[in-house]
Amino acid sequence: MKKLLVPLISLCLMAASVAARADAVETLRDFIRDVKTGRAQFTQVVTSPDGVKKKSSSGTFEFARPNRFRFAYAKPFEQLIVGDGQKVWIFDADLNQASSRKFSSALGATPAALLAGGALDKDFDLAVLPMRDGLDWAQATPKQKDGAFKSVALGFRGKDLAVLDIHDAFGQHSVLTFSQLATGINFAADAFRFTPPAGADVIEQ
């Protein structure tokens, strides 16, 4: 009887573990469906394909679904990426240069589109990953294989998004770590609008 009891206990524990991890995809779906607005600080580390070179940056990320977001990079230099639902603007303060593209062509099935409220199950294959670093992980892989990135793993601490772990089509590895996440924010009507500064070079594609 004891010999049978141990395998039964092991099977129960394994089943409980799988059930807990399976919640990561549901947590992602809940986050996309229920969290309409948010703001967080972020740090980003990009590693080159050979794994040698690393670039670090930091700033603030804001979003308001559907299809509005703002990445404001503060360090090591100022850069702004704004999606207003119609266009995506990139502004480089050092060069005083702004460029824009249509929202759909700029993002497609990308992590930014996913966070801004893209068609989750339509655009991505979802899978549960093993727990690591104290986070529950879900992986989103674009169904279209000719895009700019291969996959993104989203790490959740409870119901809060904590990490984006991105592998792009060029072999780069980017990790965005979020902190001080606040949700349910009432943004001003023009919070995700961008107007190029006077004198800036403007490139529209």
Go through the PLM ranges and name each one:
Residues 1-4:
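Positively charged n-region of N-terminal signal peptides that target proteins for export
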Residues 99, 119-125, 129-205:
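Gly/Pro-enriched, hydrophobic low-complexity segments
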Residues 7-16:
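Bacterial N-terminal signal peptides
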Residues 32, 107-121:
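Short, solvent-exposed helix-to-loop capping segments enriched in aromatics
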Residues 18-54, 67, 196-205:
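N-terminal leader/targeting segments and the immediate start of mature chains
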Residues 43-49, 72-74, 91-93, 141-143, ...:
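A generic structural motif
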